[in-house]
Curated annotation (Swiss-Prot):
Hybrid [4Fe-2O-2S] cluster binds at residues 249, 273, 317, 409, 437, 462, 497, 499. It is found in: Cytoplasm. The gene is hcp. Its main location: cytoplasm. Belongs to the HCP family. It comes from the Bacteria. GO terms for biological process: response to hydrogen peroxide. Its cofactor is [4Fe-4S] cluster; hybrid [4Fe-2O-2S] cluster. Its EC number is 1.7.99.1. Keywords: 4Fe-4S, Cytoplasm, Iron, Iron-sulfur, Metal-binding, Oxidoreductase. The keyword Kinase does not apply. Pfam families: Prismane. This is Hydroxylamine reductase. GO terms for cellular component: cytoplasm.
């Protein structure tokens, strides 16, 4: 076995990737990422001990979040870049360890004597080959008990999603140290062999609580800078002229690209999870933000090859770039791929310098005109609140009989055609609530509207599942219900990676029951852990469209 990874929905044969990742990860990259997570756990051990002594290190706190984000599926495939992260992790671990020991001695008059896990001390100087070997030792399989392993991985993947949302918020200057501290609490707990199954279940539920907080923080970050999303029509065709395509999730990167291209005759397009950017007033004001090109991440090799412009990957999801466009794709932030040009991070409060991207776009000459339809987006919670009376009236009049939450991720699996078919076959009295790239399975279908309310209400990116939760809670209040599960809402969720795990844990924390999860159940859930989720939350796998549709319409 060269590697072991089962953190995403596409893991090989629904079990694990052990020779190479379906995502494109080679064993070296996979094992280095496992080592990075392990060292982050070691940092977290010291950081949680330090806070008990009144010591807190903001740089360490944020680094743990950035490090976790780096290990999410389809973020960083570059061993050298990951190696630099590991080197910095060792340095910060040494710093917080020293600060902890000094504070302990000052407070208690003796040396720190608590048992220290290996992850908090192991170090071999910068050698990727040695680090790779160590990474292979300390991954998921290092926990022998199947149920403890399952819960530790469920917790860790939830923490990765929380870290991603929190990191995005911090980039936009919205801070919540409590979330960063919980990331460390959770990571440190995975090193504690004294914890029981019940202890880990409690931590998993606590992760759901902090997933809600992280999504709320990012919602505040996005809306305070760019305004509340508005109902907006987005063009899906192309216009003639030089072009830049921005994929990923980072709105600040898009904003800086828009600023730096203003007046240069370059059209800017979004791709994938950047589609919701068009709904924000402070982004849609740029006239050269002209449309959304393509669909979700897994189609990028075909779509990028046909896009004769510069391409910027701001966060996940990147796939192996084809030679046909490798010289015109750029990574930035935490994203990395060997041999792909990288736009460095901001320094001294300035902007990133996207000059190489702009020059490449101008050099290429650009796109030809190609017609496309318009799609409607922008139904985040504030915008939805403005049409709430209309929605409530439609429900009371029987014109809307059920809402179906079909949020989450898209992916390559043929089984995901289920979501397209479900959208087509849902009766005209149903409304789909969506967020995340799962929307691309049905957002180009002509599903019509109900008294002017679109039958696909798109709240935004995957983190904007928070908006769907807020909307559901407002509807519960409006209808005078005691339980969110009494609403005429069914949950038919598609998952792919670790941010979706965080969203799932958030829904469970809020008490949502009866979630259908597809296209497959996570491989990292042991039979016993799955049994707990089924018994307590009625989680179930998707079945056939015919069977699930019948049950959904019955509220089951």
């Amino acid at each position: 076995m060269s590697m072991f990874c089962y953190q995403c929905s596409e893991t090989l044969n629904g079990k694990a990737c052990t020779v190479a990742g379906v995502c494109g990860k080679d064993p070296e990259t996979s094992n280095l990422l496992d080592l990075l997570v392990w060292v982050l756990k070691g940092i977290s051990f010291w950081a949680t001990e330090a806070r008990k002594l009144g010591v807190d290190d903001p740089e360490v706190n944020l680094f743990v979040a950035e490090g976790l984000f780096t290990t999410i599926t389809n973020v960083n495939f570059d061993p050298e870049s990951i190696g630099k992260k590991i080197e910095k992790a060792f340095a910060l671990r040494e710093r917080i360890m020293k600060a902890t020991k000094e504070a302990y001695k000052e407070q208690y008059g003796k040396e720190f004597s608590k048992e220290v896990p290996e992850a908090a001390t192991w170090y071999v100087p910068g050698d990727l080959s040695v680090w790779e070997l160590k990474g292979a030792e300390v991954g998921a399989l290092s926990t022998k008990d199947e149920d403890i392993r399952s819960l530790r991985e469920l917790l860790t993947y939830g923490l990765k999603g929380i870290a991603a949302y929190t990191d995005h918020a911090y980039i936009l200057q919205k801070f919540n140290d409590e979330i960063l501290h919980f990331l460390q609490e959770g990571l440190a707990a995975t090193l504690d062999d004294s914890l029981t199954v019940n202890d880990y279940v409690a931590l998993v539920m606590k992760a759901g609580e902090f997933a809600v907080k992280a999504m709320q923080l990012l919602d505040e970050a996005n809306t305070s800078r760019y305004g509340n999303p508005e109902i907006t029509e987005v063009y899906t065709g192309t216009l003639p002229g030089p072009a830049i395509l921005v994929s990923g999730h980072d709105l600040l990167d898009l904003e800086e690209i828009l600023k730096q291209t203003e007046g240069k005759g370059i059209n800017v397009y979004t791709h994938g999870e950047m589609l919701p950017a068009h709904a924000y007033p402070e982004l849609k004001k740029y006239k050269h933000l002209v449309g959304n090109y393509g669909t979700s991440w897994y189609n990028q090799q075909k779509e990028f090859a046909q896009f004769n412009g510069a391409i910027v990957m701001t966060t996940n999801c990147i796939q192996k770039p084809l030679e046909s466009y490798k010289d015109r794709i750029f990574t930035t932030g935490l994203v990395g791929w060997p041999g792909v040009k990288h736009i460095p991070n901001r320094t001294d409060g300035g902007q990133k310098d996207f000059t190489p991207v702009i020059e490449k776009a101008l050099e290429l000459g650009g796109l030809e005109e190609k017609p496309g339809k318009k799609i409607v987006i922008g139904f985040a919670h504030e915008q939805t609140a403005q049409v709430a009376d209309k929605i409530i009236e439609a429900v009371k009049a029987g014109k809307i009989k059920r809402f179906v939450v079909m949020a989450g991720c898209d992916g390559r699996a043929k089984e995901r055609e289920y979501y397209t078919e479900m959208a087509k076959r849902l009766p005209k009295e149903t409304v789909i609530l969506t967020a995340g790239c799962a929307k691309y399975r049905y957002n180009m279908l002509d599903l019509g509207d109900i008294d002017g309310i679109p039958r696909v209400i798109d709240a935004g990116q995957c983190n904007d599942s928070y908006s769907l939760v807020v909307t559901a809670l407002r509807l519960k209040e409006a209808f005078g219900l005691d339980d969110i599960n009494d609403l005429p809402i069914s949950y038919d969720i598609a998952w792919y990676e670790q941010k979706a795990v965080a969203v799932l844990l958030a829904l469970l924390y809020l008490g949502v029951k009866g979630i259908r999860l597809g296209p497959v159940l996570p491989a990292f859930l042991s039979p016993n852990v799955l049994k707990v989720l089924v018994e307590n939350f009625d989680i179930k796998p998707i079945s056939t469209v015919e069977q699930d549709l019948e049950l959904i319409l019955q509220g089951k």
